[in-house]
From Swiss-Prot:
This is Phospho-N-acetylmuramoyl-pentapeptide-transferase. It is an enzyme of class 2 (transferase). Belongs to the glycosyltransferase 4 family. MraY subfamily. PANTHER family: PHOSPHO-N-ACETYLMURAMOYL-PENTAPEPTIDE-TRANSFERASE, PHOSPHO-N-ACETYLMURAMOYL-PENTAPEPTIDE-TRANSFERASE HOMOLOG. GO terms for molecular function: metal ion binding; phospho-N-acetylmuramoyl-pentapeptide-transferase activity; UDP-N-acetylmuramoyl-L-alanyl-D-glutamyl-meso-2,6-diaminopimelyl-D-alanyl-D-alanine:undecaprenyl-phosphate transferase activity. Its EC number is 2.7.8.13. One of its GO terms (cellular component) is plasma membrane. It catalyses: UDP-N-acetyl-alpha-D-muramoyl-L-alanyl-gamma-D-glutamyl-meso-2,6-diaminopimeloyl-D-alanyl-D-alanine + di-trans,octa-cis-undecaprenyl phosphate = di-trans,octa-cis-undecaprenyl diphospho-N-acetyl-alpha-D-muramoyl-L-alanyl-D-glutamyl-meso-2,6-diaminopimeloyl-D-alanyl-D-alanine + UMP. It comes from Clostridium kluyveri (strain ATCC 8527 / DSM 555 / NBRC 12016 / NCIMB 10680 / K1). InterPro entries: Glycosyl_transferase_4, PNAcMuramoyl-5peptid_Trfase, PNAcMuramoyl-5peptid_Trfase_CS. One of its GO terms (biological process) is cell division. The chain crosses the membrane at residues 4-24, 49-69, 76-96, 112-132, 147-167, 186-206, 223-243, 246-266, 297-317. The gene is mraY.
Length: 317
């Protein structure tokens, strides 16, 4: 447990030190965020805020892992590879947005192909790893379910859904950072309790790095994580839950991600079928904004909900 604590502290301080170095550099090279023209008008003033800030917690996590974990387990390396691999896709997307000077990076089908390809690699490895296999734990029943030949397609869809859901959540200052900080803290404790010590250290390190990043990402944000950060976080959550055989648990503890994704799906379906929108704007955090909620209130409420969902998730194990 002490190792988890000082892992958090080291990653936190590294991320804190990176901010004053990286933020001016991104400003200098004009790596600014383009804002959706159809988004809330209050967000237009955020145009030009440096993006690709996910580099801060990715580097902090990588450096701390190298310092703390002398002999990383295979499972910790899987999580780290997923974290970095999906982050690279996000970095490509962010770079294209910056070069084009508009909020249009990879096309939807291009991004999905890349996400599915990397998801497929991890799904295949997991299915053929004797320590992971093709079974998953069913929350509340405390039983396992062997998916057999359906495991690989399930994990591929699961990774794609998780990364996209976290990406959709990253729409307000500090929102995705705060929610994922809580989720990773929970996964660190669960990993530790299940005997996956090195994996628990990875989760703790990432939580610490996110806490340090939050100093610069909280309202008013000095930097955005970009797709570099959000896809990396989705990949990390996906990989850790996959290793623990707990992908279904993410639906509970990551209820905010699920809500954000479903709000977009229902909004699109409703408009196509009836010509009417369910929400004032999707994802749903924008609906609350347009209903008069300040960004900080939305973030606070979503964090409280996540804490409650993590407690429910704990009771389900």
């Amino acid at each position: 447990m002490y190792k988890l604590i000082y892992s958090v502290l080291i990653a936190f301080f590294i991320a804190m030190l990176e901010g004053p170095i990286l933020i001016p550099l991104l400003h200098k090279f004009k790596f600014g965020q383009s804002i959706r023209e159809d988004g809330p008008k209050t967000h237009l003033k955020k145009a030009g805020t440096p993006t690709m800030g996910g580099i801060i917690f990715i580097l902090a996590t990588f450096i701390t892992m190298a310092v703390i974990v002398k002999k990383p387990s295979d499972e910790a390396m899987i999580a780290l590879y997923a974290f970095i691999g999906f982050g690279i896709i996000g970095a490509i997307d962010d770079t294209l947005k910056i070069v084009r000077r508009k909020n249009l990076g990879l096309r939807a089908y291009q991004k999905m192909i890349l996400l599915l390809a990397i998801s497929g690699i991890f799904a295949y490895y997991s299915a053929n790893n004797p320590y992971i296999g093709t079974s998953i734990i069913i929350p509340f029943k405390r039983d396992t379910w062997d998916l057999g030949v359906f495991y690989i397609p399930f994990i591929i869809v699961y990774f794609a859904a998780t990364t996209n859901a976290v990406n959709l959540t990253d729409g307000l200052d500090g929102l995705a950072t705060s929610v994922t900080l809580l989720v990773m803290t929970f996964l660190a404790l669960v990993s530790f309790a299940m005997g996956h010590i090195t994996l628990a250290v990875f989760c703790a390190i990432l939580a610490g790095a996110l806490l340090g990043f939050l100093k610069y990402n909280a309202f008013p944000a000095q930097i955005f994580m970009g797709d570099t950060g959000s896809l990396a976080l989705g990949g990390a959550i996906g990989a850790v839950a996959m290793i623990l055989k707990l992908p279904l648990l993410v639906i509970i503890i990551g209820g905010i991600y699920v809500l954000e994704a479903l709000s977009v799906i229902f909004q699109v379906l409703s408009f196509k079928l009836t010509g009417k929108r369910i929400f004032k704007m999707a994802p749903i955090h924008h609906h609350f904004e347009l209903s008069g909620w300040h960004e900080t209130r939305v973030v606070s409420v979503f964090c409280i909900v996540t804490v409650i969902l993590c407690l429910v998730g704990f009771l389900s194990l």
